[in-house]
Design a protein with these regions (language model features):
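Basic, amphipathic alpha-helical bundle interface domains used for macromolecular binding and assembly
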Residues: 74-163
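Canonical AAA+ ATPase core
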Residues: 3-5, 10-101, 150-152
Length: 163
């Protein structure tokens, strides 16, 4: 039921709880964590569902200083004042601007070829892909690669994607 609710939220921006549909307000993003050490006892997402996530970011353990800072900030009664750096409306406007950011055809073609090379049955796939990868990235991979490149360009102050 949890996975079904997660997928409903991701696809339809709503969840159904006890027969009642609850809509999410924009902006709406899903961030999920997966701890491989504790994976036993959970239900891993099938490849088709993993394909719906834009990024899979591997995060290593914190440095001693960073971990000490976390410990100090979370085990005392002092509060940290967080100051917003942007609003939900800012996020919505940025996401719209990403869609309007141009990408030259050779760059889009490069992104598609890169994603296609992740598929073991493709002639362009490297030997290690054929040996170790069961399924490569789907079309969403190409789409998300371009969207991420556009967002990165804007964050770097450029209004076009460059290599």
């Amino acid at each position: 039921k949890t996975q079904a609710a997660l997928l409903e939220a991701m696809e339809e921006r709503q969840v159904t709880v006890a027969g009642e549909v609850r809509l999410f307000h924009l902006p709406f993003y899903v961030f999920a964590t997966q701890n491989p050490i504790e994976l036993e006892g959970t239900y891993p997402l099938p490849e088709a569902q993993l394909d719906r996530f834009m990024f899979n970011i591997l995060i290593d353990y914190l440095s001693e200083e960073d971990e000490l800072q976390v410990v100090n900030q979370t085990t005392t009664n002092t509060s940290i004042e967080l100051k917003p750096v942007f609003t939900g409306d800012d996020m919505i406007q940025f996401a719209r601007l990403v869609r309007y950011t141009p990408v030259a055809e050779p760059i889009a073609r490069y992104a598609v070829r890169l994603v296609q090379a992740s598929r073991p049955h493709q002639p362009e796939a490297f030997d290690f892909i054929r040996q170790w990868v069961s399924w490569g990235a789907g079309t969403r991979g190409s789409q998300n690669l371009i969207l991420a490149a556009k967002a990165r360009a804007l964050l770097q102050g450029r209004f076009h994607v460059a290599l």
